[in-house]
Amino acid sequence: IMPDSVSEERRKLINHYGAELILIHDDNNIGECIDECLQTAMRMAEEDPNVFVPQQFINPANPQVHRSHTGQEILEQVDGPIHGFCSGIGTGGTITGIGETLKAANPDMEIWAVEPEHAAILSGGSIGSHLQMGIGDGVIPDILNQNIYQDIYIVKDEEAIRTAQELASKEGIMCGIS
């Protein structure tokens, strides 16, 4: 169950896994659309015992896996001290879990959050639609540790697209725009 504004690549990936894709209309307010997606998922779970809803915006396992695995992997693989970490905010699990792990290793390091320009809710902005899938969902997640980051960067869609293209062409890093 996803907003109909998701990329064609995400749709194909879901279909490739054999899942039924249910699209909810994103009427220029990603927050309301995400709420409707969650309500639809909860209704389906009530009606069908085979439906599992991970509740990633409130599930403490989300940041915990980043504390115990992703954050540890970063510490093990980076040669030398880590001075900064930047992460988009979607469910809040990545920045919370990795941020807490890295801060424990170096309390002086800086952590920056990233929000899309048209869904910068943490920065006090309005909620609209944007192209940076996976972040800026129009909600402040329950699992987000808002004390872990020092600053929030607001990124325009065009800037995110341009940066992803530069990373691909100059560094060979094939990442998405979020």
Features from the language model and the residues they span:
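Generic beta-sheet signal
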Residues: 1, 24, 56, 112-114
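Short glycine/serine/threonine-rich phosphate/pyrophosphate-binding segments
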Residues: 1, 6-11, 88-99, 178
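Active-site-proximal loop->helix
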Residues: 1-44, 122-140
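Receiver (REC) domain switch/active-site residues of two-component response regulators
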Residues: 20, 83, 150
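Short acidic/polar capping segments at secondary-structure boundaries
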Residues: 27-29, 58-62, 91, 117
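Active-site/ligand-binding loops adjacent to catalytic centers
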Residues: 35-38, 45, 50, 104-177
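Active-site/ligand-binding-proximal alpha/beta "capping" segment
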Residues: 48-89, 146, 158-173
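Short, well-ordered alpha-helices that flank and scaffold nucleotide-derived cofactor binding pockets
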Residues: 76, 100, 104
